[in-house]
Regions:
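A short helix-loop-beta-strand connector motif used in the catalytic cores of GNAT acetyltransferases and
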Residues: 45-60, 90
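Residue-level recognition of the GNAT/N-acetyltransferase active site
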Residues: 92, 97, 101, 130
Length: 166
């Protein structure tokens, strides 16, 4: 199976939406219906991706048919939110098509974002993840991310803020 990595663009938005729905669909089983509806409306909204693409680098993984099977966004420092400091870059929306799980795609996407952050002289990379994202937490911890603190629950689930000194 030939997998390739490239920069994602606005023309990829329909595939990014489709991938997110596939990837995040597993959480429908563990979220209360109201929370799933809220999450689904975010991941299925094209504006979610167009707004990220305005400020962030998008790294995608494609299969031999050029279908996007993985994505991650690197938001540069200077984009503070209620949980991210302005001096941090952010790793966002790491997602993999479930039929491609276990092939190292999420880890490679994360490593590519770390490498790009180093090239851009970022100092700290941050991300948030939850108790329902065991596989993701394992990948992040294996790459050196550590829990900075627990943040207020989202979707009635525990969430943590992780950081990595670059």
């Amino acid at each position: 199976m030939l997998l390739q990595f490239r920069t994602g663009t606005n023309s990829d938005i329909p595939q990014l939406q489709e991938l997110a729905i596939k990837s995040w669909g597993e959480y429908e089983k563990v979220l209360l219906p109201d929370y799933w509806i809220k999450l689904f409306s975010n991941i299925s909204n094209p504006d979610t991706y167009s707004e990220l693409l305005e400020i962030a680098h998008c790294e995608v993984c494609t299969n031999e048919e050029n279908t996007i099977v993985g994505m991650a966004f690197l938001v540069p420092s200077g984009n503070a939110t209620e949980i991210y400091e302005a001096s941090w870059c952010q790793l966002r929306f790491v997602s993999v098509d479930p039929s491609y799980n276990g092939q190292g795609i999420a880890k490679t996407l994360t490593q590519k974002c770390i490498s790009l952050a180093k090239q851009q002289n970022e100092q700290i990379m941050a991300l948030h993840t939850s108790e329902m994202m065991d596989k993701a937490r394992h990948i992040y911890e294996s790459l050196g991310f550590t829990i900075l603190k627990e943040i207020p629950p989202r979707f009635n689930k525990k969430y943590w803020l992780y950081t990595l000194t670059i």
